[in-house]
């Protein structure tokens, strides 16, 4: 307890602790912390060539069929997977003491997604893996962000389960700010 804060609106954007933040006001949010993998490749010559020719970085790409996403990371790529064989992490609560420590990676578990990624982005198949990361994210049951006003709690808003922060964060922030100020998110946030 650090004192009282008076405000017109409250936004639960608690990330891994969104469940705990919700419980502070009596909410049990439908969220689950799951393991989530991504990898960083070594330098990819085709990317270096593209950067030098255009003076630009590669765009962020989501391949829904392949259940992967990529973005340029230095002179290589960050390649993330939306795993079919998901593993829950701390299913009931996230300890307040958790400091974003990484979890043990499992290359075998994500190899089906990686194979699709390599097929859809052939230069990545030849790239070495510089680092493999596995860390927890919160997910809603439908895989979409849990966003909007919370029924029964005036001016209490949810911006939770934004698991792909660099691809969804800006849109979630814009929709929520429109909703809070204008009364409408400005587009369908439930699709």
Where do the model's predicted regions map?
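Flavin-dependent oxidoreductases
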Residues: 1-103, 112-123
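C-terminal catalytic lobe of FAD-dependent flavoproteins
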Residues: 57, 65, 74, 87-89, ...
